[in-house]
Amino acid sequence: MARRPSTDDLRSGPERFMALVKTTVPPVHPAGLPFIGAGLALAAAGRRNRWVRGAGLVAAGANAAFFRHPPRVPPTRPGVVVAPADGLICLVEDAEPPAELNLPARPVPRVSIFLSIFDAHVQRIPISGEVVAVEHRPGLFGSAELAAASEDNERNSVVIRTDTGAQVIAVQIAGLVARRIVCDLTTGDKVTIGDTYGLIRYGSRLDTYLPEGTDIQVLPGQRAVGGETILAELP
């Protein structure tokens, strides 16, 4: 049956235009506002010079796109783990969790997502639960596409324990250009699947470590949508 148009659907003029903008253009993460502001300030300061003005506007637009924070609708099925970020599934393998977490040194399933500079760089909670550990480790800034990035690059690890006792680890990894990891979580936080918890600036990688026996639902080469794509189902 056809849907009756709502009052919002019948608006016209400026109100209708603004409504379309709000539903089409994603909001920006607060961490990106200083970078957008810097580009606009450059454009304003160089308004008499078209090259400077253009460079400032391009920089502001590029940062607005990079720091975009699109709304997502996570699945409601219990026991699923969603992608913590947008990007390309680059590795699906078994690997030991980060050593700084002091967890048992035995391989567990790991899914790695590479984020290019064109992906949205906010990170999202992969599964609901409680944060039981947050550990930052300094390191290199090599290409995040390489397998060695998981071990060599700077990283920030978050361990989430579900209501059933399963532990899922999300690891933010800095890349060749990305040199600033932002994580808003602390130990003891209660988190909900799909919520935003941080970001990495300008190209990076996300590793998700899963319990043994987890049923992986993705393959290398597949595109992931943060907060929506199901990476795995817990045993």
Swiss-Prot record:
The UniProt entry's sequence similarity note says:
Belongs to the phosphatidylserine decarboxylase family. PSD-A subfamily.
Q: What is this protein called?
A: Phosphatidylserine decarboxylase proenzyme
Q: Which organism is it from?
A: Mycobacterium sp. (strain KMS)
Which subcellular locations apply to this protein?
Answer: Cell membrane
Quote the catalytic residue positions. 204 (schiff-base intermediate with substrate)
Task: Give the bilayer topology.
Answer: Peripheral membrane protein
Catalytic activity from the UniProt record: a 1,2-diacyl-sn-glycero-3-phospho-L-serine + H(+) = a 1,2-diacyl-sn-glycero-3-phosphoethanolamine + CO2
Q: Which cofactor does it need?
A: pyruvate
